[in-house]
């Protein structure tokens, strides 16, 4: 299975003590896990929306994600983005999140961005979209 390949790679790279694979985490425990991270790295090539990015931002964690899908919409302009499969770019972006002034801005603006995605706001926007479709507004 792929998880075994990842664990083998981490061991060969000497990262087995720095990378943790978590499974079956209850939703209520996610904020504490996010808040224990230095940076949330999400180089996914395809996602339906990117809810984990919003969870990280809401937890005050800087985000580094891939370009080319919905992740930029989820993460907003104060997250960092790299091309998929750009290993050097990913490493550089992760390192940038440790720069104190950039990190502070990413955290502050990320928290503000995440507030735009409340359940109430999403429901309002969805209903407005349906209204426009049903009344044929464009």
Task: Locate each region found by the language model.
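Carbohydrate transferase catalytic cores enriched for Leloir-type hexosyltransferases
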Residues: 1-138
């Amino acid at each position: 299975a792929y998880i075994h390949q990842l664990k083998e790679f981490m061991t060969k790279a000497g990262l087995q003590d720095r990378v943790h694979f978590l499974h079956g985490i209850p939703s209520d425990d996610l904020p504490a896990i996010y808040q224990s991270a230095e940076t949330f790295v999400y180089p996914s090539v395809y996602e339906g929306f990117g809810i984990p990015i919003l969870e990280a931002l809401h937890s005050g964690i800087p985000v580094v994600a891939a370009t080319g899908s919905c992740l930029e919409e989820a993460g907003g302009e104060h997250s960092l983005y790299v091309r998929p499969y750009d290993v050097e770019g990913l490493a550089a972006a992760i390192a940038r999140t440790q720069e104190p002034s950039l990190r502070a801005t990413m955290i502050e603006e990320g928290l503000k961005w995440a507030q735009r995605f409340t359940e109430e706001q999403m429901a309002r926007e969805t209903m407005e979209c349906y209204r426009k479709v049903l009344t044929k507004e464009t």
